[in-house]
Amino acid sequence: MGGLCGIISEQPCAVDLFYGTDYNSHLGTKRAGLATYEKDCGFFRGIHNLENAYFRSCFEDELEKFIGNSGIGVISDTDAQPMLVNSHLGRFAIATVAKVNNAEELAHKFLAQGMYLTEFSSGIINITELISLLIVRGKDFVEGIENVYREVKGSCSILILTEDGIIAARDAWGRTPLVLGKKDGAMAVTSESTAFANLGYKTEAYIGPGEIVRLRANGYEQLRKPNPRKQVCSFLWVYYGFPTSCYEGRNVEETRFNCGKAMGEQDTVCADCACGVPDSGIGMAVGYAAGRGIPYMRTVAKYTPTWARSFMPSNQTTRNLVAKMKLIPNRDMLEGKKVLMCDDSIVRGTQLSNNAQSLRELGAAEVHMRIACPPLVYACPFVNFSASKNYLELITRRIIKEWDDEEHLAEYATTGTPQYERMVEEIRRRLNLDSLKYTTIETLVKSIGIPQEDICLHCFNGSSAFTLEEENR
């Protein structure tokens, strides 16, 4: 996915920018970059590969080089960024969190017009460069960003560091978040509000869909009003978000707790304890235990000092190894227990199957599973979710394809239909679980606590208020 952070202050910004960007590290592990601006020295940029190192270890030894009172940072799962640009709009640094489904089309369009693309990453078009080319075609930054909203099929949130402040622009449909923070003499913008607390910022406002603002050290001004409708990615609350973060005023951990509590109150399975698959399954498990009236127990613990999230590595074998090695079952708490596990989602199913087998081998009498979202039946066309680049990576779609029944996807995605029940039972069988239940869309929406029409649920039911064809008309 990726995360953004921007700081502008009356004092040097490097420390706040360093830690603020680091607090977005759970959103990506491929590359990271920082850029700062100082009136006399201009722009300074640094980019590092994160695939074999953490953000802090990459940047802490060179932090003194990032001088100036304003800067932007990015955790990226794709491009090398921020990019430095010199144009008729002036010099600026730009960072994005984007998924551009029509990148090839836009690239060919630019080339046909006599323009050129200078920066490639592993032979892949640099999306941030495409975005910058769209922006510099405007007479000002607002018109340029509106070009992005009009031309890009997918999603794009942007930070632009200029000589006159930081411009922040949220995706046109609000699919990816940006939130403003404030403290004495400084303003911040970030993807994750969890970045604010330890740095002394308080949440000032949630940037709306398509809204554009300019930050200065003493406050911010609106450059473009938000669009009237939004489609916020529901997976922000289910999986991506850090527990202390809030999106649209709704806290991640509270949402997960509410979801688990609702499932616990409705469930009838006989279990001795509830346990969450770390990290994003824990909040749901605590809620489930409260709703069901059974104890929450850490029958599985994550070895946190060195293991990152397992969906990040691009190689499936590496992902499986990371998933296995980072989670350590507690034999003494498993012996003879009927264990109910809670997890955020099931993508491929490989890791969950291995976890269930490990619990049984260490003495669990039964292993039940409850999932914090409905089955993932459709690949996401809007956000770079690293775990499902191809729909056939989804266990649901592999099963449906094996049954040669893809013309009935809507029925498989609808809770309670015969097709849905058959699919869930087949997943349960393949994962060697004693029982398996998914949250319903209704429970998920209620747990999030904002209107359903404001939430993107495409990966669950294939429907979005705005299709790729419609959204830019």
Where are these regions (language model features)?
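Extended, hydrophobic alpha-helical segments in both membrane/secreted and soluble proteins
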Residues: A274, G281-Y288, R292, Y296, ...
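Conserved short alpha-helical segments that host acidic/polar catalytic motifs at enzyme active sites
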Residues: M1-G208, R214-A271, V277, E366
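Short, glycine/charge-rich flexible loops or terminal/linker lids adjacent to PRPP-binding catalytic cores
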Residues: G293-V339, V377-K389
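PRPP-dependent phosphoribosyltransferase catalytic core
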Residues: D164, G200-Y206, A356-R473
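A glycine-rich phosphate-binding loop feature that marks nucleotide/adenosyl-phosphate handling sites
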Residues: Y37-D40, E163-G165, G276-M284, G291, ...
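Phosphate/diphosphate-binding loops
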Residues: A195, K202-T203, I207-E211, K261-D267, ...
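A generic structural motif
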Residues: R31-T36, R298-T304, V367-C373
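Flexible loop/turn segments at secondary-structure boundaries
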Residues: P12-A14, N102, R175-P177, F196-A197, ...
